[in-house]
Every structure is written in C-alpha cells, then in structure tokens.
Amino acid sequence: MNAYRLYLVTDDQQDLATLKRVVRKAVEGGVTMVQVREKHGDVRAFIERAQAVKDILKDTDVPLIINDRVDVALAVDADGVHLGQSDMPATIARELIGPNKILGLSIENEEQLTEADSLPIDYIGLSAIFATPTKTNTKKHWGIDGLKMALETTSLPIVAIGGINESNIPQLSATGVHGLALVSAICHAEDPKAASEYLLGLMR
C-alpha cells in the first residue's frame, strides 16, 4: 500500500477536540498518513496533541508523523518525523530515531533536490507546489512542470505540498506523484470523512 497517497497535515489553530474529530473522520474516509504540525504551541501541548492522534491511529495502518520535533516523536513513539530545511539535519535525526522510522524532508529548490538522494531520508515533501495560505514563507512555487522535473530527478517518493485542492488534484495525480499533502481541504471541511473520500476519488 502507498502510505503517502493522501497525506493529512493537521491544523495547529484547531483545538484538541476538533483535531481529534478531524483525524478520526479523515482516517475513516481513507487518509493514509497523518502529520501533526504545531508551529505555535509549547512542547507539552505538542506532546498532548500528538499522543491524542496516536491513540486514534493505534488500531489502523495509518502512520503518525511529527513535524519538525524529533523529541516529540521520540516522546510519543511516533512512526516518523518530517523535517524542514531549518530543522535538525537529516543525518542527526536519523541517528536519533533509528533506522526503522519514517523520515521526510521538505525540499524547496533544485539544489536541495539534488542533495536529497544522498541523505538518510525516506521521502521528500516538495514545497510549495502552488501558493498557499498556510505556507507564507516559501520563496518558490514548483508548479506542475517543477513537480514533473523533480519526479525525474530523484529516486525518492515525493509528496506534493502547498495549495493543493480539488481543482488541481487530477492534474497533480496525472504526474505520477506518490502522494498529496493537504491541510485545509480536510481540516476545514464540514465532513472530513466525506472530504477525504472525495479527494481520494479525484486521484486516478
């Protein structure tokens, strides 16, 4: 099974009860991986939220990924970590989490892309594909052509991130990309289960 296919990234603006409801419903709808992302909270709150998501995922095959924080991933024994370019180096993160955990890395330009295959990572988060309200600091948008180029450049699985919604999913899926990461299309949906089912249906 392709665990990267429909990759939910949580919204750190949502309270704990909403987070739990969204994740539970999204997994029922077919989400294949969940990344808990916290940019504003303290570590204790991050651990609490990560543990709550882990409890929801424990009887499923859906991996739990922690954004940025290796310490939080270790604290809750998550399935993996997703690093940004300004986070801990991938080589050090790999030493800390061990060989069997999933390690992802955000890639924002061609130089980082060419280096990626030499790093001890399992997948790439190609960011940002399109302009997005949740990623205000990205300097480059890859677009469809950039995504196609990246798929030809690296042997690693690619998860497309940034500005992805129902209008561009068919076009993205047609590139053969391994997975699509979404925040608002699922987290802000009235019915996250139905939204996940619908989004999966657009991926042909």
UniProtKB/Swiss-Prot annotation:
NCBIfam families: thiE. 2-[(2R,5Z)-2-carboxy-4-methylthiazol-5(2H)-ylidene]ethyl phosphate binds at T132, P133, T134, G163, V183, S184. 4-amino-2-methyl-5-(diphosphooxymethyl)pyrimidine binds at Q35, V36, R37, E38, K39, N67, S106, K135. It comes from Vibrio campbellii (strain ATCC BAA-1116). Its cofactor is Mg(2+). This is Thiamine-phosphate synthase. Pathway: Cofactor biosynthesis; thiamine diphosphate biosynthesis; thiamine phosphate from 4-amino-2-methyl-5-diphosphomethylpyrimidine and 4-methyl-5-(2-phosphoethyl)-thiazole: step 1/1. It catalyses: 2-[(2R,5Z)-2-carboxy-4-methylthiazol-5(2H)-ylidene]ethyl phosphate + 4-amino-2-methyl-5-(diphosphooxymethyl)pyrimidine + 2 H(+) = thiamine phosphate + CO2 + diphosphate; 2-(2-carboxy-4-methylthiazol-5-yl)ethyl phosphate + 4-amino-2-methyl-5-(diphosphooxymethyl)pyrimidine + 2 H(+) = thiamine phosphate + CO2 + diphosphate; 4-methyl-5-(2-phosphooxyethyl)-thiazole + 4-amino-2-methyl-5-(diphosphooxymethyl)pyrimidine + H(+) = thiamine phosphate + diphosphate. Gene3D superfamilies: Aldolase class I. Condenses 4-methyl-5-(beta-hydroxyethyl)thiazole monophosphate (THZ-P) and 2-methyl-4-amino-5-hydroxymethyl pyrimidine pyrophosphate (HMP-PP) to form thiamine monophosphate (TMP).
